[in-house]
Amino acid sequence: MKRGKKYQESVKLVDKTKLYDPVEAMELVQKTAKAKFDETVEAHIRLGVDSRHADQQVRGAVVLPHGTGKKVRVLVFAKGEKATEAEKAGADYVGAEELVSKIQNENWFEFDVVVATPDMMGVVGRLGKVLGPKGLMPNPKAGTVTMDVAKAIADIKAGKIEYRLDKTNIIHCPIGKVSFGTEKLVDNFRTLMSAIIKAKPAAAKGQYLKSVVVTSTMGPGIKVNPLRVSE
């Protein structure tokens, strides 16, 4: 794939042989973001685990101190008092079977996160084949299957993100916008990395953090020293 002139200019700013510390990396990710929109900054973390084994899964959620810069639309599956609680807490969509039908029949996906009360999981389970591949299925580990829907919504709106391994043992997560500046991006990055390090499975052997790369939406990858991610 041929890259544009701006991308080629950005690539020249990055030393491909160097492992940057987090502060240097965040400064560089801003310099290499040349798009006319406020690019998202992403972290890509390759782990020394095997996601094919159940005891080597890495999955969880963390509240980024400065959020992601993105307005997150929350759908809540709940009934009765819990539905009212969700509406008061600022959920964008609240419902039960009628929302399942809407998703199934209209291919409707105008939401970013799904929360459900435990009693609704039998209903939500019917959407497993469509929500699962999109990473939208509610999950207790991520705090999205809960009776405390108000807290779940507040955390998500405040910048809570879910992290999980893909099939190639890499975690991909947004950590903010280029406009955040170095300090906020570093704060968010360190918070994410601390959560991933704490989530290390007991069955994982050898080096846990294989590689860490940060990039803006349209920018080149910048390698971060795995030994310095908490600094």
UniProtKB/Swiss-Prot annotation:
CDD domains: Ribosomal_L1. The keyword RNA-binding applies. GO terms for biological process: regulation of translation; translation. The keyword Ribonucleoprotein applies. It comes from Acetivibrio thermocellus (strain ATCC 27405 / DSM 1237 / JCM 9322 / NBRC 103400 / NCIMB 10682 / NRRL B-4536 / VPI 7372) (Clostridium thermocellum). PANTHER family: 54S RIBOSOMAL PROTEIN L1, MITOCHONDRIAL, LARGE RIBOSOMAL SUBUNIT PROTEIN UL1M. Belongs to the universal ribosomal protein uL1 family. SUPFAM superfamilies: Ribosomal protein L1. InterPro entries: Ribosom_uL1_bac-type, Ribosomal_uL1, Ribosomal_uL1-like, Ribosomal_uL1/biogenesis, Ribosomal_uL1_3-a/b-sand, Ribosomal_uL1_CS. GO terms for molecular function: rRNA binding; structural constituent of ribosome; tRNA binding. It holds the Pfam family Ribosomal_L1. Part of the 50S ribosomal subunit. This is Large ribosomal subunit protein uL1. One of its GO terms (cellular component) is large ribosomal subunit. Keywords: Repressor, Ribonucleoprotein, Ribosomal protein, RNA-binding, rRNA-binding, Translation regulation, tRNA-binding. Binds directly to 23S rRNA. The L1 stalk is quite mobile in the ribosome, and is involved in E site tRNA release. Protein L1 is also a translational repressor protein, it controls the translation of the L11 operon by binding to its mRNA.
